[in-house]
Amino acid sequence: AQRIITVSPDVTVSTNLSGWVNQRGLFHVNGQTDMFTVEELQTMHRWRASPTGQHIELGIAENNLFLLLAAAGLSHSIFGERLLPVGTIYDPFIERGLDALNYACYQDARFLLVATPSGISLAPEGGAHQSIGTPLIGMSKPGLASFEPAFTDELSTIMSFAFSYLQHEKTEGEDTAIEADLLGDRCGGSVYLRLTTRRIEQFEREIDDTLMSEIIDGGYWLVPPQSSCSVVIAYIGAVAPQVIESCDELNHDSPGSTAVLAITSADRLHRGWMEAQRIRYRGLEKCSAQVEKLLGAIDSNVRIVTVTDGH
């Protein structure tokens, strides 16, 4: 935790970093007096500024956010000491700093980008706060693995993976295109989490090794298909409650007719499928991607309905 630094462009409170800042403090080259403490004012925010603080507060400057994430994410190659930078931002405002994000990924900087709120949980603000196209941004960036979990146990699993993934390095001369590592996880990269502030009822379940692997690889069967399955609803992110409700209604009318495929990363499902095709082209015919394994459980005539909180 001493190597984690957080940074936010004017949205520290609204992206729920207040508790972290209370514990770890703001970074400032010189110590600053907390006037709330001096004046004995009541506040939930105890933000002490000092050279040992681990949160950097920016103004409304998303481009600066990505420049800072890039610089901090390259600390291991410049100074020989790795930092684990975490940046929080409103999801649609990623577009304000795309050029800096492109170059950060191009340089193989390592960081965790947390974008929240997004989609329907941000849409009521209207205007420029429309988070629609960002899933495509996440899929299109080499060196950036994007995830969009719906449940907290999925998020916990992904974050545990992410902090290791940020630190992985490719061994010189190592061939990354092997069946055991279709997604190139041994080489590492940065991670983008597209999250929501929507209240979603959580499951009480145990994440075993198999489910953990499926969550990280991009998807799993939330409601497994039965032999009578005729429809699959594949969803990602905050639309989970409506999908589960629809599945219950359809299966009530026609038992076993509907299955639900929970996608945690469309990016990694697609990337794994593309890499599997390349490997098969090279002669490894038995290689199969996660999405192929999942869809292999249903007949070819089953209809698939996809639902996403975006475009």
Where are these regions (language model features)?
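Beta-strand segments within the central parallel beta-sheet cores of soluble alpha/beta enzyme folds
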Residues: I5, R82-I89, A150, R194, ...
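Short acidic-aromatic active-site loops that bind/stabilize oxyanions
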Residues: Q54-E62, E148, V232-I236
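Short, intrinsically disordered, charge-balanced linker/junction segments flanking boundaries
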Residues: A1, E62, V307-H311
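Short coil/turn connectors at secondary-structure junctions
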Residues: Q2-I4, S50-G53, I78-P85, Q107-F111, ...
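Short, flexible loop/turn elements at secondary-structure junctions
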Residues: D10-V11, I60-N64, I89, T197, ...
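Thiamine diphosphate
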Residues: N16-I137, M139, S146, E154-S160, I244, L261, ...
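Active-site pocket-lining segments that scaffold enzyme catalytic pockets across diverse folds
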Residues: A1-S14
